[in-house]
Amino acid sequence: MILELDCGNSFIKWRITAKNDAAVISGGVVGSDAALLMHLSNLPDTSFTDCRLVSVRSAEETARLVSLLADTFSVAPVCAEPAQELAGVINGYDDFARLGLDRWLAFVGAYHLARSACLVIDLGTAVTSDFVDAGGAHLGGFICPGMPLMRNQLRTHTRRIRYDDTEAEKALARLVPGRATAEAVERGCSLMLRGFALTQIEIAQGYWGNDFAIFVTGGDAALVADVLPGARIVPDLVFVGLALACPLR
């Protein structure tokens, strides 16, 4: 079996897949290296012989996690690296190494699935969009704050905005004008994300008409799903690209 890791700025997403058919056996999201080791150590009847990961953390943080995994589970993790080209996709950044690896693998994975022009929107701590044409050329993309960043900035810099996560969840049940602070903030931020997503569609249509695929991924994908009815919601899109970047025999 294979342990796959997507090490983001805030969380580590993990899953264990079968080596022969890539079926997902187990998975989850944790907030720290220690929590990851605890979860993996407590899995019943599950062992893995290989590990591959993508990380947007610092080199030191990534090396520390690789060392912990090697010492604890006797595996040799393979790490995704920046590339100018992968699986038919050409990196569109002027300095290809500066493109976030999670973004890179997400749209490489999307192009692999679609084999056509595609728009990829990832809604996590940050929100990103990327455009890949039918020939695999990455045309660039956009980055803006995601729901957690927008919410936390308002809570941090506006003294009278205070509410908990339970209130936040309830507030998103509807998108009518808010009659309480939590409703106003959560719904306002949600509408901003939806507006961002719709603008990406307009840009993609300017390139390709309606001849393109739309992929949405990330923890907050559900917030825009209803305004993108033709989109494919693929929570593990980064892992699709990771398998292409780090094939294991």
UniProtKB/Swiss-Prot annotation:
Job of this protein: Catalyzes the phosphorylation of pantothenate (Pan), the first step in CoA biosynthesis.
Binding site for ATP: D6, C7, G8, N9, S10, F11, I12, K13, T125
Gene name linked to the record: coaX
This protein's record includes keyword Phosphoprotein: no
Enzymatic class: transferase
Protein name: Type III pantothenate kinase
Compartment(s): Cytoplasm
Main localization category: cytoplasm
